[in-house]
Regions:
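Residue-level detector of functionally pivotal "anchor" positions at catalytic/ligand-binding pockets or at interdomain
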Residues: 302-310, 384-403
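Acidic, glycine-anchored loop motifs typical of Ca2+
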Residues: 111-120, 138-140, 149, 157, ...
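A domain-level signal for the mature, folded cores of soluble proteins
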Residues: 22-101, 126-302
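C-terminal outer-membrane/trafficking sorting elements
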Residues: 392-403, 407-471
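Solvent-exposed, low-complexity, repeat-rich "mucin-like" stalks and linkers
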Residues: 305-338
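Extracellular/luminal low-complexity segments enriched in Ser/Thr/Pro
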Residues: 354-362, 369
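Short, exposed coil/turn segments at beta-strand boundaries within extracellular/luminal domains
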Residues: 372-380, 459-465
Length: 471
């Protein structure tokens, strides 16, 4: 009898937990930007709405910068500090390791009680929000190139920039939202406004494209985990511990002045593509979401609540100086008076008292930011430095390539002219050198530890560097 009572109690707890789970209940607005999945079901038509309601395995694209969706839950989502890691809901996308298509997230409380998202939006400020590269109220106007097939789409913004969203060979339909599926979008041009964050796209490895993950606070940024999707991940650590996806704390909300605001609960969520970039054969960066889930209280599930974030260095630094930026967060809120110390891995560079990096020659750099008040918190960034030698290589000069990537015991280097090669570790140490012959040369790297390396080839008229991986 006692055993039956115990089992009955456990069953009741489990059933109660399932019953309390909240998912997207209603989509109020879906207005995507152009993109490769637009006008294609199920990702890029209104049919995608049904997929994201009631679960976390739908398929909805928001397109390139500015595309958005507004949704709500059946009941308000409470800002509950008793939730795991203090987070209140999780949004799931189709991100994976080294591939992020980040979206900004906004929340709204139904203050007038009419059940509609017509009150004030508050952005949940993510890890990159306070960096100088982030643009608030970035407006992009998309122009319809016409026709029913894929054509490059012109765009311009309110900062004087313009360009083309370049189509690829894999999606041949028009990438501009069609009147058939999106009659409310102007068939000639339309403007989308939102927060832009600078993302880091790496195409240095042959056949491999990476869009590096932001630390926290953006949708379609972290991969889905294998754990219960109702048990969130800690947004302040890099490991995927539970559900994966991207967990959000309502306490990250800021107003139009960039000031944190206290909101006890929210009724509506807006997810909006926040990046702009081409990933080569993979197409444009475009946020996708699969669903969202409310988080239930569990005060026993706790973890790290502080994180140091350093603004991305360029993949290749071609200037002799660069302003470094870092931010320190406690419970996802930035600490405004935090101070940082910087250390560099090589004597080719130093950081001055104003956090400006000064570089004296080309090479490989690893820079570590440390919280001055607590050296436990650090963040490291790497980059290749290519300063001008005063001799410009002609545009038709051959380059060299490295394959396979990743390599194992051997790496092949293909070049049509001789040179001197150096293999560098991530911290700038030379670990292998030699003379590079013409055509294809096989180099033994079996003695090198798996990880990322840089191959520098010095020609008679300049230097070139490639990044590759050994596994």
């Amino acid at each position: 009898m006692i055993m039956k009572r115990v089992l009955f109690t456990i069953l009741c707890i489990v059933v109660a937990g399932i019953a309390s789970a909240q998912y997207i209940n209603r989509v109020f607005d879906y207005k995507p930007a152009p993109g490769q999945f637009i006008n294609v079901s199920p990702w890029g038509t209104p049919a995608a709405i049904d997929g994201v309601i009631g679960g976390v395995y739908g398929n909805m694209t928001l397109g390139a910068f500015g595309g958005y969706v507004v949704f709500g839950f059946e009941a308000p989502v409470e800002n509950d500090p008793q939730n795991p890691f203090g987070v209140d809901f999780t949004i799931f996308g189709n991100a994976y390791s080294n591939w992020s298509e980040p979206a900004a997230v906004f929340v709204m409380k139904d203050e007038n009680g009419n059940g509609l998202p017509d009150d004030s939006w508050y952005q949940l400020a993510g890890s990159d929000h306070f960096f100088s590269s982030t643009k608030i109220n970035n407006e992009i106007t998309w122009e319809n190139p016409g026709g029913e097939s894929a054509l490059d789409i012109p765009w311009s913004d309110n900062f004087g920039n313009s360009g083309l969203l370049e189509v690829n060979e894999f999606h041949l339909q028009s990438w501009y939202p069609s009147q058939e599926f999106f009659p409310e979008i102007d068939p000639l041009e339309y403007m989308l406004s939102g927060t832009f964050i600078d993302t880091k796209i790496d195409t240095s490895s042959q056949g491999i494209v990476k869009s590096y993950v932001r630390t926290f606070g953006y949708a379609d940024n972290h991969a889905r985990g294998v754990g219960d999707h109702l048990i969130p991940d800690n947004p302040y650590t890099s490991e995927i511990e539970n559900s994966g996806g991207d967990a959000f704390d309502i306490s990250w909300a800021i107003n139009d002045l960039g000031e944190y605001v206290d909101i006890d609960q929210i009724d509506f969520v807006k997810v909006q593509s926040a990046s702009m970039g081409s990933a080569g054969w993979l197409g444009e960066l475009s946020t996708e979401i699969c669903g969202a889930a409310d988080v239930a209280p569990d005060p026993q599930l706790k973890g790290e609540d502080k994180v140091l974030v350093m603004k991305d260095l360029p993949l290749v630094l071609k200037s002799s100086s660069l302003q470094l930026e870092s931010a320190f967060f406690i419970d996802g809120r930035v600490v405004p008076d935090a101070r940082f110390d910087y250390a560099v891995s090589s004597d080719i560079a130093y950081v001055d008292e104003k956090s400006v990096l000064h570089v004296e020659e080309s090479g490989i750099l690893s820079i570590t930011a440390t919280l001055a008040s607590n050296p436990q918190y650090t963040c490291t960034q790497e980059c290749v430095v290519e300063l001008s030698t005063g001799i410009e290589m002609a545009s038709d000069d051959p380059t060299f390539s490295v394959f396979p990537v990743p390599a194992t015991d051997f790496v092949n280097v293909k070049s049509v002219r001789p040179g001197i090669y150096h293999f560098f570790t991530g911290n700038g140490q030379i670990c292998l050198s030699g003379e590079l012959e013409t055509s294809v040369q096989q180099i033994d790297v079996s003695h090198l530890t798996p990880g990322f390396y840089f191959l520098s080839v010095i020609y008679s008229d300049g230097k070139q560097i490639r990044k590759f991986m050994i596994q």
